[in-house]
From Swiss-Prot:
Subunit structure: Equilibrium between an active dimeric form, an inactive hexameric form and higher aggregates. Interconversion between the various forms is largely reversible and is influenced by the natural substrates and inhibitors of the enzyme.
Name of the protein: ATP phosphoribosyltransferase
Family statement: Belongs to the ATP phosphoribosyltransferase family. Long subfamily.
Gene coding for it: hisG
A cellular component term, taken from the record's GO annotations: cytoplasm
Amino acid sequence: MLDNTRLRIAMQKSGRLSDESRELLARCGIKINLQQQRLIAFAENMPIDILRVRDDDIPGLVMDGVVDLGIIGENVLEEELLTRRAQGEDPRYKTLRRLDFGGCRLSLAMSVDDEYSGPQCLQNSRIATSYPHLLKKYLDEQRVSFKSCLLNGSVEVAPRAGLADAICDLVSTGATLEANGLREVEVIYRSKACLIQRDGEMPANKQLLIDKLMTRIQGVIQARESKYIMLHAPSERLEEIITLLPGAERPTVLPLAGDKSRVAMHMVSSETLFWETMEKLKALGASSILVLPIEKMME
């Protein structure tokens, strides 16, 4: 039986978000032995229990107060929210933050042989999907009537099997659609993983742990988005070089032995367009440019 004084976190047991959720917790310093068949794991160094469940069970576990936190795709969360509202419920939860993984899109797709001129051409079509409420919300906004064909897997085979005229399914690269003779025609929802919390006041010990976890998650995400840069540069070009580096604070500047015209610069910067940035740095006279990954970061 689980100890109610420990923080309970639900995450996907296997699937699209499982590995990255596990990596996030590990990089936050939570030591957990996640053996393949165990559905409950206990942190060795913090009062945290991990429940490994199906992804579509996670929103309900949080909304019903069974667990304190959940790592879940926004698409699954929104579908559960719409489902419960359609049943007359008033589901409550808090979104603590969007995470930097699990990106995908929910899209309409049709046969490569069919013409598509916009959502209106789907009027009265039969559409196969695992996300009936998200699909209905979108097509209601477009004032398009349709017939839903609910499938919980292998949605992409529905048109060839004669079950549907089109599909609404998750797309990452589009390779699965192409393999089944389909093409993406409309994106109706963009999703990433997010961290959610149950509604209601949290006991002080759990809230303290959540605050600590949030600080660490922020540090992990910032570290993944940033790089530590070291370079040599002409002293008179310092300000131009600093301007080139997005997100950089004022750098550490050190003299170079035996060369008063140049300095060493150390700084943290985002990696956005960094190959282009490196070429511009070189054009300004920078040399010995090193870009290093950052494991942990805290402001």
